[in-house]
Amino acid sequence: MMDRIEKVILRNLVYNEEYLRKVLPFIEPDYFNDRNERVVFEHITKYASEYNSLITKEVLQIEIEDRRDITQDEVKNIYGTINELEDIECDFEWLSDTTEKWCRDRAIYLALMESIKIADGQDDKKNRDAIPTILSDALSVSFNRNVGHDYLEDYEERYELYNKKESRIQF
């Protein structure tokens, strides 16, 4: 059986702490189409921010059971989603790159859908001037946190660059 990327992401958010710490700040609940997966993700996020550790499947099930805004049938479906999460090894670099691409694709898709609603006049809160900002924010989704210079860590490279002797060509 082939897993969807959403399932792979949820699985690794439950079992892979390094992955959780790297990607969790960039994933939004709206990126998940399936309500069951969205609910599971919300509980993973809540637990990680509250306890600063990985959640277990048992804790997830207990947390879901305590919710009052979902029906018993939805609880059963969410339990099914949770039970499908198994600890399967994945290459970390591939997983990070694929998750970043998925986040960017979902952000762009959702931004386009929101832009269409605004253009059709279905959104009373935003006008057409908001569309470029919405699309720009979606296009800028990236896991790269290396923005600018780190003056303490990059000093050797900068020193070499500043003091590099360039060969000059005479006219």
Regions found by a protein language model. Give the residues of each.
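The Walker A/P-loop phosphate-binding site
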Residues: 11, 142-171
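Short, flexible helix-adjacent loops and helix caps
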Residues: 49-52, 120, 164
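Noncatalytic partner-interaction/assembly domains of nucleic-acid and motor enzyme complexes
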Residues: 1-102
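Interdomain "pre-motor" coupling segment immediately N-terminal to P-loop NTPase/helicase cores
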Residues: 86-152
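Short, surface-exposed, charged/polar-biased interaction segments
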Residues: 30, 44, 61, 81, ...
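Intrinsically disordered, low-complexity boundary segments flanking structured domains
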Residues: 65-68, 82-85, 136-143, 156-160
